[in-house]
């Protein structure tokens, strides 16, 4: 029999990196076309007027203006300034 046992590896260290999701531009803020408004998984919020949706459901401004969140309809739009 061995007089020393084998080393066991740590059971920690498998956590994935955070994906930095969430609101990047808040309601009332001015934005330029192309500015990211929200990074999300799935359509938690939908694109309204002057807002585009990326391949990963990112919402971004299509025109310059002010961000407006429509809470009851879960929609984001850009009001042209």
From Swiss-Prot:
Residues 1-22 are annotated as: Disordered. Pfam families: Ribosomal_L27. Keywords: Ribonucleoprotein, Ribosomal protein. One of its GO terms (biological process) is translation. It comes from the Bacteria. Gene3D superfamilies: 2.40.50.100. The keyword Ribosomal protein applies. One of its GO terms (molecular function) is structural constituent of ribosome. GO terms for cellular component: cytosolic large ribosomal subunit. Belongs to the bacterial ribosomal protein bL27 family. HAMAP family: Ribosomal_bL27. This is Large ribosomal subunit protein bL27. It comes from Opitutus terrae (strain DSM 11246 / JCM 15787 / PB90-1).
